[in-house]
Amino acid sequence: ILQDKKPIAIRVPSNGVVHTTEKVDEEYSYESKYKVMHKGSEVAIIAAGSFYQKGENVVRLLADKGIDATLINPRYLNEVDADTLEALKTNHNLVVTLEDGCKDGGFGERIASYYGTSDMKVLVCGVKKGLYDRYNVEQLLKDNRLLDEQIVEDVLALI
């Protein structure tokens, strides 16, 4: 990592280490710029943090249904990338946000708020607000419609 102007944090992935052939960013001056990993149309998946692999899975499942969805890695969650979000308006009807945290006041709601006065539909996928202690992860995902297949069902119902 070549960035030496600001603090950094290296996170240990909670969902395991996944091999990728994607080039690793060495420089981080793009703070509020999202990275479009795959450019499609009609549906855009913005998958944050440990839910990025879930985003890849959802895009793959949508492709099996004939939908070439855009996949975006937001990289930073503190600000919206207005340029990228505006560009999606040209050939997308639905933006889906995936986050492994609480939806209330989270990243997805920020994206929904950005599109509030436009015709863009936004599906915010995250965990409902609550106190979760000693829970089964699969059951929590299922209860919040966060299983890959459930997300695809919800997308298909909206387009």
Give, region by region, the residue ranges found by the protein language model.
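Thiamine diphosphate
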Residues: 2-159
